């Protein structure tokens, strides 16, 4: 009996060692996740782009340069730069990880919203498409930075007007793709 137990102990230890590796929690993302960059950099500063420019919309639409102060132009350039940098970071991510284990995303549990796992599955289906959306956003913001630095309302206005569409295109592909057909129908009906 002692001899059998003595021989069985190494096999049990080996089996336990192999099993233990499978029970370890998933290693945390080493750097910012997709959600980190979206929440803390892109969304935050895109909202600030609109906050700075909405009061300067002219009576006939577009950006009215007489309503833009030097400080507003400076703030616009800074916020557009922050969005550009965040978008550039996402466009260069090797492995795009939505969140770290145990975290949640905005709109999870909200009707029409998706869980992090659902968003991750959409990204995993076409990660290059997400990188391309991010690169497009970065290029759009680069143009806005140049227009803001030049205090050129004629160039900045249309870029700001297009920003919602640039963002929404990516959101419809990755964040809430089941609403894409509805949005496209509404757009067609309102043309």
Predicted feature residues:
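C-terminal active-site/capping subdomain that shapes the small-molecule cofactor and substrate pocket
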Residues: 11
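Charged/polar interaction segments and conserved charged motifs
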Residues: 1, 83-86
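Sequence context surrounding c-type heme c attachment/ligation sites in exported
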Residues: 19-68, 73-77, 81, 88-191
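Bacterial N-terminal signal peptides that target proteins for export
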Residues: 1-8
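C-terminal motif of bacterial Sec signal peptides marking the signal peptidase cleavage site
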Residues: 14-17
